[in-house]
Amino acid sequence: MAQNERIETICSTQRMDLVFTIVSKGKGESVLDVFRENNILQNTICHGHGTAPSSILEVLGLGATDKDIILSFVKAENSKKILAEISKKLDFSKPGHGIAFTVPLESVAGIMSFKFLTADLTEEV
């Protein structure tokens, strides 16, 4: 019971966001550079392929459908700063350069998982 209370305390005081960043294939490393520069090391890069018809892609100003999808765990208090840096570095103000958004993490099962995501592996469990 005490361990469950500890997890609830940690989760309620240290909010995390899952940042999704979708960019053209090959641009994922530039996104990872931003996270690394901010000492955010819990990142996963996946490869994706869009399925929208080419006529829709042309209207949206999107070209190639091969994408890098980067998933990153960020302290909620740092999310806006990180999104701004990614947007600036990859020029998201231009159509077809990418998108980034956050999803708040409400809970994580397991204290070690939470500590891994928050890069706090210094305490004994």
Regions found by a protein language model. Give the residues of each.
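Positively charged, small/polar-rich N-terminal and surface patches that mediate targeting and assembly
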Residues: 1-125
